[in-house]
Regions:
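Extracytoplasmic/secreted envelope proteins and their assembly/folding machinery
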Residues: 41, 72, 76, 87-90, ...
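Conserved C-terminal helix/tail region of periplasmic/extracytoplasmic solute-binding proteins
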Residues: 300-330
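Sec-dependent signal peptide recognition
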Residues: 2-10
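Short, glycine-/small- and polar/acidic-enriched structural segments
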Residues: 26-170, 184-190, 201, 206-207, ...
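Secondary-structure end/capping motifs
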Residues: 228-309
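Pocket-lining segment of extracytoplasmic ligand-binding domains
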Residues: 98, 170-264
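Bacterial signal peptide processing site
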Residues: 21-23
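C-terminal motif of bacterial Sec signal peptides marking the signal peptidase cleavage site
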Residues: 16-19
Length: 330
């Protein structure tokens, strides 16, 4: 009897680790680079804060690169598994003729997320206020400056003719340059724009996203190697993003702000709530991570308008919606 009990106990001890491994799958670490740290990308911080990535067996480590080019470089070098960047970066890489070009696997935002900041408050802002003025627009060829040029042109403002747009300052240095005295206006993302206004360093006078209309603005890229070797990780990542996109649709501004607050230690809860409210009202976030071809064509039109388009890559060559569609249950 004792011998039988000992054998059963030994078998139980052998099987116990297997049972535990089924209940707790091995966590995979994903290195993901982003352009900047902004509430504009709220769904991904919510996915982190609410444990959506963890529930998919993912440990997502985020590095802030300071611009789309740097984020894309990290992906191309293998330093990043995924990167969040402007889709124009992928267009440029394809037009360089790179065979192993990165692929867009999901879309996060659907319009420009920046705000026009002036040095003094404007009770009734008019785009004519920019006549003869200088605007810090960001890096030439980047989405922030291209949508800015698009909007300004629609309002009769042409760089070099009746205004000046500075296109030589890196994205992550724009706020510092403006604070240091350069330019009459600058475009900034949240929460920097609101924090700037609270500190009296500048004043929000216009919402670029409302003026520009819908356009794919920030997307998730994966390398072809990642797609080939670890498709399940991409799908798991996008499932978490989709859950966050759906969650923020019905969450209160306060709940959304609290969920992402750990990733914005320098911003107050009130500021985060105000920013969430602003981006929600402007319909900035995608409701699912699937990019639409019509939106992609609009993107190419914006790039072409800015004189930065040397070729029009086919939608199916740059975008792979397979993972996003599975994540969203389509």
């Amino acid at each position: 009897m004792k011998r039988t009990f000992s054998i059963l106990l030994a078998l139980l001890l052998l099987l116990l680790p297997l049972a535990c491994s089924d209940a707790q799958p091995e966590t995979v670490t994903l290195q993901r680079h982003e352009v900047t740290r902004s509430v504009f990308y709220a769904p991904q911080y919510i996915a982190l804060g609410l444990g959506f990535f963890a529930e998919e067996g993912l440990n997502v480590e985020i590095t802030t690169s300071g611009g789309s080019e740097k984020a894309m470089t990290a992906l191309l070098s293998g330093e990043a598994d995924l990167c969040l960047a402007g889709p124009e970066t992928g267009v440029y890489v394809m037009n360089e003729g790179k065979a192993d070009h990165p692929v867009i696997v999901g879309q996060l935002t659907k319009r420009d997320g920046s705000f026009l900041i002036a040095r003094t408050p404007a009770e009734r802002f008019s785009w004519n206020d920019l006549l003869g003025k200088t605007v810090i627009g960001g890096r030439a060829g980047g989405m922030p400056i291209m949508t800015l040029r698009w909007v300004m042109a629609q309002n009769g403002l042409v760089d070099g003719e009746n205004c000046t747009i500075i296109d030589s300052i890196q994205f992550n240095l724009m706020a510092g340059a403006f604070e240091g005295g350069e330019g009459d206006y600058v475009t900034l993302f949240e929460p920097t724009a609101t924090e700037f206004q609270k500190a009296g360093k500048g004043y929000i006078v216009a919402n670029i996203g409302l003026e520009s209309g819908e356009v794919p603005y920030t997307c998730y890229f994966a390398s072809q190697k990642m797609i080939s070797e670890h498709p399940e990780r991409i799908e798991a990542f996008l499932r978490a993003i989709y859950r966050a996109q759906q969650w923020i649709e019905t969450a209160s501004d306060e709940d959304a702000a609290k969920a992402m607050q750990p990733y914005f230690p320098d911003a107050s809860l009130d500021s985060l709530m105000a920013v969430v409210k602003s981006y929600r009202e402007t319909d900035s976030w995608m409701k699912d991570p699937i990019m639409r071809e019509s939106a992609y064509e609009r993107l190419l039109s914006v790039i072409d308008f800015n004189g930065e388009l040397s070729g029009r890559p086919a939608f199916a060559e740059l975008v792979n919606n397979t993972f996003a569609e599975k994540a969203a249950g389509e």
